[in-house]
């Protein structure tokens, strides 16, 4: 979450008259994340999250995101729920941006996740994949192979400012993945961004998943690889196989991976590491000065990409074959 667009209190109060949420008591911006402008609101009825959708988010995608949260919640997944306006619409407008009110989810994200938490995340990810079955709206993954190349073209000229020699290395990686990427693995709705700050816990119990604004239709095992990258490396860059084993066991307790998915996991992990390297690289180079947003180091994901190149089997991630 982040803040790119400021809001005036009077405009916010007028916006809230379209909802049955009581009167505004206080509000503040939330700096974490990189995509939309987010605010924590306290009203006389309940705390809420206000999201203003910025230019990177296509307005035509918003029915998918908001509808998906409704669909998953109705099937028992703990996640935020968009609040309807008095006219029944889920989307309004504030400060020149499409805007929505979202229910507040209790919990905190973990700064130092342990293996037991990774097991819960794996289980919750599989539960989301199963709950997503039957969701009728479709959204292609804008940050898959074609999207990676487009991002790279915007950043390539300045890439060596981050590390010398990056241009040739990333060009070669893109070409390799384009030729080797699997096409026929099981697919469905994926979260595509299930990092620790998008998973809330109350104590050691997972209380819910948030931030579905990268969700799309893609390979389910690709979503697993994103979580391995996001949860199972230590601050020094080392892969923690105990966390990986726990996450994969948790996932497979709900939805067992097929043999083809298991064989493809190292390749998928290379792809997901490259995806987050490229978006971080773009944001690192292009984010405007003064934006209330937390930029993230792209080199973290370059090191993960290089790690996955050395992996010969999913067993090296902790998967029991």
From Swiss-Prot:
Q: What is the superkingdom listed in this entry's lineage?
A: Bacteria
Q: Name one Pfam family in it.
A: APH
Q: Which HAMAP family match?
A: Homoser_kinase_2 (MF_00301)
Q: Quote the catalytic activity from the record.
A: L-homoserine + ATP = O-phospho-L-homoserine + ADP + H(+)
Q: Give the EC class as a word.
A: transferase
The pathway is: Amino-acid biosynthesis; L-threonine biosynthesis; L-threonine from L-aspartate: step 4/5
Q: Which InterPro entries does the record match to this protein? A: Aminoglycoside_PTrfase (IPR002575), Homoserine_kinase_II (IPR005280), Kinase-like_dom_sf (IPR011009), Pseudomonas-type_ThrB (IPR050249)
Alphabetized UniProt keyword annotations = Amino-acid biosynthesis, ATP-binding, Kinase, Nucleotide-binding, Threonine biosynthesis, Transferase
**E.C. code:** 2.7.1.39
- This protein is called Homoserine kinase
Membership in a protein family: Belongs to the pseudomonas-type ThrB family.
Q: One of this protein's GO BP terms?
A: threonine biosynthetic process
State if Flavoprotein is listed as a keyword. no
Q: Which GO terms describe its molecular function?
A: ATP binding; homoserine kinase activity
């Amino acid at each position: 979450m982040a803040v790119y667009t400021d809001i005036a209190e009077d405009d916010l109060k007028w916006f809230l008259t379209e909802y049955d949420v009581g009167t505004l008591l206080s509000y503040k911006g939330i700096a974490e994340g990189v995509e939309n402008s987010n605010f924590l609101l306290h009203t006389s009825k309940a705390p809420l999250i206000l999201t203003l959708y910025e230019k990177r988010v296509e307005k035509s995608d918003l029915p998918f995101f908001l509808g998906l949260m409704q669909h998953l919640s109705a099937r028992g997944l703990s996640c935020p729920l968009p609040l309807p306006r008095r006219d029944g619409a889920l989307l309004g407008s504030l400060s020149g941006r499409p805007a929505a009110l979202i229910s507040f989810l209790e919990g905190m994200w973990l700064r130092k996740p342990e293996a037991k938490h990774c097991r819960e995340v794996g289980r919750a990810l599989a539960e989301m994949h199963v709950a997503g079955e039957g969701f009728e709206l479709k959204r292609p993954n804008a940050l898959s192979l074609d999207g990676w190349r487009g991002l790279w073209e915007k950043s390539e000229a300045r890439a060596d400012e981050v590390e010398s020699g990056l241009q040739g290395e990333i060009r070669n990686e893109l070409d390799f993945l384009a030729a080797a990427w699997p096409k026929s693995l099981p697919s469905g709705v994926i979260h595509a961004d299930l990092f620790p700050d998008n998973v809330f816990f109350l104590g050691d119990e997972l209380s819910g998943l948030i931030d579905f604004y990268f969700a799309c239709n893609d390979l389910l095992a690709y979503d697993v690889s994103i979580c391995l990258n996001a949860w199972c490396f230590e601050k020094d860059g080392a892969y923690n196989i105990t966390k990986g084993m726990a996450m994969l066991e948790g996932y497979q307790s709900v939805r067992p991976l097929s043999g083809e998915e298991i064989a493809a996991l190292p390749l998928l992990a290379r792809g997901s590491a490259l995806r987050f390297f490229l978006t971080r690289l773009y944001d690192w180079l292009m984010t405007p000065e003064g934006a209330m947003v937390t930029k993230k180091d792209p080199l973290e994901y370059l090191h993960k990409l290089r790690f996955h190149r050395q992996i010969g089997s999913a067993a090296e991630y902790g998967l029991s074959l």
